[in-house]
């Protein structure tokens, strides 16, 4: 017998055992069958709403990847334009490590042959779980509250210790905030720099 998706998802959520839960989702079935609550729509929106109500669901694993790339039922378009519109950090694994690395140091914009570039130094780390492996670059308007929970402010997630700034005429003021990520996606405090672009 075929199990009900919502029933399974709630069961998985209940017995997640304080571990990250990623629900496998068949792209083709999701767009092939109607939402039982809304027969005029396929199941994508209903599944997203359900996932958002379940506290242990950290994401979705899609299969087959080809179906996503082929944009069956406009699935990929809906994800790119709505649910996955902004960059995201990997889910944290606090049961392995929950200590954040130190923040980047010496953040400084410099003119180079390639344009205006924001540079920073990697923080020191003694053990594998203290070392910064990536950096998140956020951009905020001058005077705007620095909120690293707002993914719409992410302009880059990079292993590099620099970011090429989109210079225009030097009249617009921004604050760039850079954080360090370790291998478990623990995020450091913010290192800030005001720039004029």
Regions found by a protein language model. Name each.
Residues 123-149, 190:
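Solvent-exposed loop/turn segments flanking beta-strands in beta-repeat/beta-sandwich domains
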Residues 74-130, 183-197:
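Pro/Thr/Ser/Gly-rich low-complexity, intrinsically disordered linker/stalk tracts
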Residues 149-156:
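Local beta-strand/beta-hairpin segments that build beta-sheet-rich folds
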Residues 165-188:
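Beta-strand-rich modules
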Residues 158-164:
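Short S/T/G- and acidic-enriched coil/turn segments that sit immediately N-terminal to beta-strands
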Residues 1-2, 9-95:
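Substrate-binding cleft of secreted/luminal carbohydrate-active enzymes
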Residues 115, 132-136, 173-175:
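Exposed beta-strand and adjacent loop surfaces of beta-rich binding modules
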Residues 60, 120, 137, 178:
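Hydrophobic, well-ordered secondary-structure elements that form the walls
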């Amino acid at each position: 017998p075929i199990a009900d998706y919502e029933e399974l998802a709630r069961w998985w959520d209940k017995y997640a055992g304080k571990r990250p839960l990623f629900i496998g989702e068949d792209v083709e079935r999701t767009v092939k069958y109607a939402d039982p609550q809304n027969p005029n729509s396929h199941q994508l929106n209903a599944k997203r709403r359900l996932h958002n109500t379940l506290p242990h669901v950290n994401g979705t694993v899609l299969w087959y990847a080809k179906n996503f790339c082929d944009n069956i039922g406009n699935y990929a378009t809906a994800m790119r334009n709505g649910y996955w519109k902004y960059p995201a950090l990997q889910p944290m694994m606090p049961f392995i490590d929950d200590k954040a690395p130190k923040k980047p140091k010496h953040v400084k914009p410099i003119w180079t042959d390639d344009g205006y570039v924001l540079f920073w130094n990697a923080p020191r780390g003694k053990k594998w779980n203290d070392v910064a492996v990536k950096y998140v670059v956020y951009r905020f308007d001058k005077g705007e509250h620095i909120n690293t929970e707002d993914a719409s402010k992410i302009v880059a997630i990079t292993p590099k210790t620099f970011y090429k700034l989109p210079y225009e005429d030097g009249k617009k003021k921004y604050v760039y905030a850079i954080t360090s990520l370790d291998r478990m996606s623990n995020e450091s405090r913010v290192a800030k720099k005001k720039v004029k672009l």
